């Protein structure tokens, strides 16, 4: 809500003027539950009206969005307006660790003032080497991202055609919204895993309203269009079982036992 942000910036500006402090606006590049992109372009547009620094946590955007995979900022054409860019090696790079990119002044301040930096061990060299290799692959093998988006588009368009609600995702994160209880959701994902060889995470109350099940899918480059079709067929099956009350009866039996 940009209007709400402006009101908060008005208040923050008055406080900063009194205390001599500064203002940091933080947004996610991609919201991990719903897959929607942050309104980075609109936030960047008001930097001329307010004196603030802009931090973007782009865990799900880095490596998957933008012409070169630089993330949601590049996708929205405002990468140079981001003052502090944070992302992880655990998503698109399938590894461990994370990084912060910023001006040297900011990096030096963090390096010598952050508790987590001072009292933490360095990232293992094998993970650093792996991250550098994956960065090189992002730059030199654009076909990997193209294949990823081929799979993403096939999955998301296929789900929509089959009548599934996937919200308004703008990324690889593919949420599927179903109606059901937490016990039903637990039986459902077990069914997906054991009968269809599909692993996905569930999100339930209190993260989302009661009575809603959110299944969160994220395709990869190594998946095939055949995998996508199998997934779509599996979701048809689990929806039928959910709406037919099968998971409700199964979950009731588990609770009773």
Regions found by a protein language model. Give the residues of each.
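Short beta-strand
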Residues: 16, 23, 86, 120-121, ...
């Amino acid at each position: 809500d940009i209007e709400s942000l402006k009101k908060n910036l008005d208040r923050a500006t008055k406080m900063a003027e009194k205390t001599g402090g500064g203002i940091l606006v933080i947004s996610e590049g991609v919201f991990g539950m719903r897959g929607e992109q942050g309104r980075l372009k609109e936030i960047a547009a008001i930097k001329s009206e307010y004196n603030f620094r802009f931090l973007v946590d782009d865990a799900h955007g880095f490596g998957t969005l933008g012409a070169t995979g630089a993330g949601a900022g590049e996708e929205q054409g405002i990468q140079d307006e981001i003052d502090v860019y944070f992302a992880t090696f655990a998503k698109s790079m399938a590894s461990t660790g994370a990084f912060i990119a910023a001006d040297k002044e900011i990096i030096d301040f963090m390096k010598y003032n952050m508790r987590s930096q001072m009292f933490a061990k360095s990232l293992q060299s094998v993970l650093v080497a792996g991250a550098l290799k994956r960065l090189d692959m992002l730059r030199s093998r654009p076909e990997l991202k193209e294949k990823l988006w081929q799979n993403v588009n096939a999955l998301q368009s296929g789900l929509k055609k089959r009548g599934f609600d996937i919200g308004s995702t703008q990324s690889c994160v593919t949420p599927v919204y179903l109606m059901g209880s937490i016990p039903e959701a637990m039986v459902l994902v077990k069914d997906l895993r054991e009968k269809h060889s599909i692993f996905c995470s569930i999100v339930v109350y209190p993260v989302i309203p009661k009575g809603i099940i959110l299944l969160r899918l994220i395709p990869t480059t190594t998946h095939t269009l055949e995998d996508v079709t199998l997934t779509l067929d599996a979701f048809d099956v689990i929806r039928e079982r959910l709406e037919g009350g099968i998971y409700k009866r199964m979950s009731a039996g588990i609770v009773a036992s």
